[in-house]
């Protein structure tokens, strides 16, 4: 199935125009994956790059979002952090006009609370979440939204208590990887590469489970 590349420009309050990328199948499939990156972990880093490839192979269109502070090489602080959701909505709104019936939002670190906020606000019939190294209150208030949460035990933000607190949630599935850090990598490149297909495979299975 052919895939076209569509640029989604967003005039950001960080003072730049960001050109987000939508990879869309022809003809449309009705399924969308939105990628919300981390602060320093963009959509071109391994986890999000290969998740994009897996999602495309499953027939999802993929919107890869870039934040204005990243394009502007600006510092993110308490005052301008509120602009992030403006960047996200600026990219997502015109894409949703294509009429998707199923949307999965994949957030990495900084992108995880933004993903949760977006998921709660969408009026799309079916919405799900992939939270890669969730931070803050990203898992709060998700209610009946199907969610896959992934973290490593060497992540400074890993908390067995937090995992346990959501262990009985009927719609949240945790995958905890021994020895992986906040980038879901290990100390050596071989171990990091070995972990990558397993993580992407879990995400792929989750997307398949949400497949029409």
Task: Give names to the regions the model predicted.
Residues 143-144, 149-151, 155, 163:
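Short beta-strand/loop motif that positions the catalytic acidic residue
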Residues 94-95, 198, 202-210:
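C-terminal alpha-helix
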């Amino acid at each position: 199935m052919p895939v076209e590349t569509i640029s989604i420009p967003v005039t950001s309050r960080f003072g730049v125009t960001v050109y987000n990328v939508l990879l869309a199948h022809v003809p449309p499939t009705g399924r969308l994956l939105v990628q919300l990156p981390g602060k320093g972990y963009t959509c071109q880093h391994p986890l999000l790059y290969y998740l994009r490839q897996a999602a495309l192979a499953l027939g999802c269109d993929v919107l890869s979002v870039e934040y204005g502070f990243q394009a502007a090489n600006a510092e993110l602080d308490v005052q301008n952090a509120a602009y992030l959701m403006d960047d996200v909505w600026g990219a997502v709104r015109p894409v949703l006009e294509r009429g998707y019936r199923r949307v999965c939002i994949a957030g990495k670190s900084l992108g995880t609370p933004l993903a949760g906020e977006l998921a709660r606000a969408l009026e799309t019939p079916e919405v799900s979440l992939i939270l890669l190294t969730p931070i803050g209150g990203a898992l709060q208030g998700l209610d009946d939204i199907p969610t896959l949460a992934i973290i490593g035990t060497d992540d400074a933000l890993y908390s067995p208590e937090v995992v346990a607190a959501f262990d009985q949630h009927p719609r949240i599935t945790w995958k905890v990887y021994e020895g992986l850090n906040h980038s879901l990598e290990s100390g050596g490149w071989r171990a990091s590469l070995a972990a990558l297909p397993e993580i992407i495979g879990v995400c792929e299975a989750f997307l398949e489970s949400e497949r029409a």
